[in-house]
From Swiss-Prot:
Subunit structure as annotated in this protein's UniProt entry: Monomer. Homodimer. Homooligomer. Self-interaction correlates with nuclear localization and efficient activation of transcription. Monomers suppress local silencing by interacting with and inactivating host adenosine kinase 2 (ADK2) in the cytoplasm. Interacts with and inhibits host SNF1 kinase. Binds to ssDNA. May interact with host RPS27A.
Purpose: Multifunctional protein that modulates host antiviral defenses and promotes host attractiveness to insect vectors. Acts as a suppressor of RNA-mediated gene silencing, also known as post-transcriptional gene silencing (PTGS), a mechanism of plant viral defense that limits the accumulation of viral RNAs. TrAP suppresses the host RNA silencing by inhibiting adenosine kinase 2 (ADK2), a kinase involved in a general methylation pathway. Also suppresses the host basal defense by interacting with and inhibiting SNF1 kinase, a key regulator of cell metabolism implicated in innate antiviral defense.
Motif (Nuclear localization signal): 17-32
Region of interest (Transactivation), residue spans: 120-135
A Gene Ontology term for the protein's cellular component: host cell nucleus
Pfam families, alphabetized: Gemini_AL2
Name of protein: Transcriptional activator protein
Signal peptide location: none
Keywords: Activator, DNA-binding, Host cytoplasm, Host nucleus, Host-virus interaction, Inhibition of host innate immune response by virus, Metal-binding, Phosphoprotein, Suppressor of RNA silencing, Viral immunoevasion, Zinc, Zinc-finger
Single GO molecular function: DNA binding
Compartmental location: Host nucleus; Host cytoplasm
Annotated source species: Tomato yellow leaf curl Sardinia virus
């Protein structure tokens, strides 16, 4: 019996489990970068134009990013190597507070702010409460 499909190519599709198995074996293309602090990281080759901040120091991952940080005056190739090899320090925009934990307000037993404008809440009847519960 002939196939009713108009296609002349009758290849079977690869099962998804086999596709996943093949994808797991594929090498991830990435580059290792060692930092001055002793840490190292791997950067995927597709993410080469993205920098990151580590321990308050910004690290550039491409010459385009260097050009951005050097305000595009001239190509980073023409700058001295000391400027390029040193990571750019980010300025801290906040004041140093010794205790970074904010205290939580204690719960009070008085009226809450939301119900302070509603008078006579203690005078509600059972039918009033049942009406509110039905909403």
């Amino acid at each position: 019996m002939q196939s009713s499909s108009p296609s002349t190519s009758h290849c079977s599709q690869i099962p998804i489990k086999i596709q996943h198995h093949i994808a797991k074996k594929r090498q991830v293309r990435r580059r290792r970068v060692d930092l001055d602090c002793g840490c190292s990281y791997y950067i995927h080759l597709d993410c080469i134009n993205h920098g990151f901040t580590h321990r308050g120091v910004h690290h550039c991952a491409s010459s385009n990013e260097w050009r951005l940080y050097l305000r595009d005056n001239k190509s980073p190739i023409f700058h001295d190597n000391q400027t390029q090899s040193e990571p750019i320090q980010q300025q801290i925009q906040h004041t140093n507070i010794p205790n970074q934990i904010q205290p939580q307000l204690e719960e009070g037993t008085g009226d809450s702010q939301m119900f302070s404008q509603l008078p006579h809440l203690d005078d509600l009847t059972v039918s009033d409460w049942s009406f509110f519960k039905s909403l």
